């Protein structure tokens, strides 16, 4: 069906949304026979994509998903399911809304992204080629929703096709490449080259082809009809120039969209599976009313697994985020760790890190040099262990330098593990400093990004832990209830639906109110 023919009949059906994402953790079973196999995660984008698609699907939206075909990560038997057989397999699923970008560069990968900075743009180009040449013509979407820099070329092509496009900025990372590289990947860049963002003003196609680099993230913002960040405050911080490390091109293009009234911040939400009432990874499930004894049991189970002293009465701090000193602030904790633990040694305070990253080694060094065995645990990331960590801990550490959204501080509240955060971005939008006497607030917030600020906030957490049990339990139960009501993916999905409907100028779901 041609675009023109489709437009003449489009009013007779629900608008069709194509979500283009390089990461996903799961998809609803009703979207196709392969939905249960699809899990490719590098960070929060995968969780957010999965939650949004699931919520849109549950609300009755005609939502489709395009993602790379990571055969190895999807646990598909590559030896028995070669490309031709896969096409036959997919042809038996007429209702499938899952569209896999086929390229050998995806098939044998163990991770979504490469450690090689040269390889990641090649992966993005292969994904883009399949989306533009095969998936969009097949799906015939009314609106395309792109996510992060790997999809940054798609909005330019979508604008050329006359398809409205929403671009979500999940983080500030970007890559650069040339029109020649785009051409060599099998993409007809001449069709939409003028809709891309370059390091210098382009005069013509040939002049720009080999030397004028394209900024992929800025191109996505520049060419899209509407953009969103994943928290209102992070958008405000970008527009007001609060962070000097944000690339100038990206900041200016976001400012332009904001001035035009085409930018908004939508707070992400944790996945529906982040629920202590049903979580299969924790020792004892619980809700706000039963959290006290259940969290004690979970604490002992977690302590046993990570090698901490088994005692349900000691305060436990939990670090669930990757150990990335450029964003997540592990160096702040490393700076104060010995002094903080020394001050509270008699109280037997414990800290557990379940996270990967370049800063894991300094924590191992601190552990062994100061012989903090039984008090400090440093473990590789494991999803089940991380979930148990939320259920076991009293406090969740999220001292990020900047945070486009952040999910750990929200998940912590759902599990009764109060967050300790730096006042920035999505952390500002989701955490208010606790006043236990007034039954207000939900965590511990420091404003100045340095180790003394984190130390102050952790001391406030210890003060709260020393409160009378009834005060502590009352506030934790309140935080859990409020978090459950506020942080859910249906609320997030409805915010996206409002944008979709604004862009389409018609309802997305007939029954949506």
Regions found by a protein language model. Give the residues of each.
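Catalytic cores of nucleotide-sugar-dependent glycosyltransferases that transfer UDP/GDP/TDP-activated
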Residues: 1-513
């Amino acid at each position: 069906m041609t675009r023109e023919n489709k437009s003449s009949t489009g009013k007779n059906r629900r608008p069709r949304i194509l979500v283009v994402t390089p990461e996903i953790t799961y998809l609803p079973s009703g979207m196709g026979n392969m939905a249960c196999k699809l899990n490719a995660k590098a960070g929060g984008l995968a969780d957010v994509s999965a939650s949004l698609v699931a919520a849109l699907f549950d609300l009755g939206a005609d939502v489709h998903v395009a993602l790379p075909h990571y055969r190895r990560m999807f646990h598909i038997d590559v030896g028995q399911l070669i490309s031709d057989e896969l096409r036959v397999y997919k042809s038996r699923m007429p209702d499938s809304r899952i569209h896999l970008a086929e390229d050998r560069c995806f098939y044998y990968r163990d991770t979504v992204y490469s450690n090689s900075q040269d390889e990641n743009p090649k992966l993005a180009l292969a994904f883009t080629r399949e989306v533009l040449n095969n998936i969009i013509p097949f799906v015939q979407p009314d609106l395309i929703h792109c996510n992060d820099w790997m999809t940054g070329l798609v909005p330019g092509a979508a604008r050329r096709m006359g398809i409205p496009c929403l671009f979500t900025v999940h983080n500030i990372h970007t890559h650069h490449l040339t029109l020649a590289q785009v051409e060599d990947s099998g993409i007809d860049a001449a069709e939409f080259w003028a809709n891309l963002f370059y390091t210098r003003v382009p005069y013509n196609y040939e002049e720009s082809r080999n030397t004028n680099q394209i900024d992929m993230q800025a191109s996505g913002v520049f060419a899209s009809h509407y953009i969103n960040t994943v928290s209102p405050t992070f958008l405000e911080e970008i527009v007001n120039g609060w962070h000097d490390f944000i690339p100038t091109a990206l900041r200016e293009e976001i400012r332009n969209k904001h001035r035009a009234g085409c930018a908004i911040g939508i707070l992400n939400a944790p996945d529906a599976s982040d629920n202590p009432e049903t979580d299969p990874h924790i020792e004892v499930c619980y809700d706000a009313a039963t959290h006290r004894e259940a969290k004690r049991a979970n604490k002992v189970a977690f302590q046993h697994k990570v090698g901490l002293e088994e005692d349900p009465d000691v305060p436990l701090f939990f670090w669930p985020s990757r150990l990335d000193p450029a964003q997540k602030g592990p160096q702040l904790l490393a700076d104060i760790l010995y002094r903080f633990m020394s001050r509270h040694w008699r109280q037997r305070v414990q800290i557990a890190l379940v996270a990967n990253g370049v800063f894991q080694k300094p924590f191992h060094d601190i552990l062994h040099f100061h012989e903090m065995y039984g008090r400090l645990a440093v473990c590789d990331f494991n999803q089940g262990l991380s979930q148990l960590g939320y259920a076991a801990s009293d406090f969740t550490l999220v001292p990020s330098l900047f945070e486009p959204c952040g999910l750990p501080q929200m998940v912590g509240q759902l599990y009764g593990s109060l967050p300790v955060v730096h006042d920035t971005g999505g952390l500002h939008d989701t955490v208010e400093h606790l006043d236990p006497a007034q039954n207000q607030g939900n965590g511990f917030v420091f404003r100045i990004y340095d180790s003394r600020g984190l130390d102050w906030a952790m001391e406030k957490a210890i003060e709260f832990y020393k409160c009378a049990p009834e005060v502590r339990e009352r506030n934790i139960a309140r935080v859990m209830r409020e978090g459950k009501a506020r942080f859910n993916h249906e609320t997030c999905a409805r915010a996206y639906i409002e944008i979709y409907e604004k862009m389409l100028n018609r309802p997305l779901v007939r029954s949506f109110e």
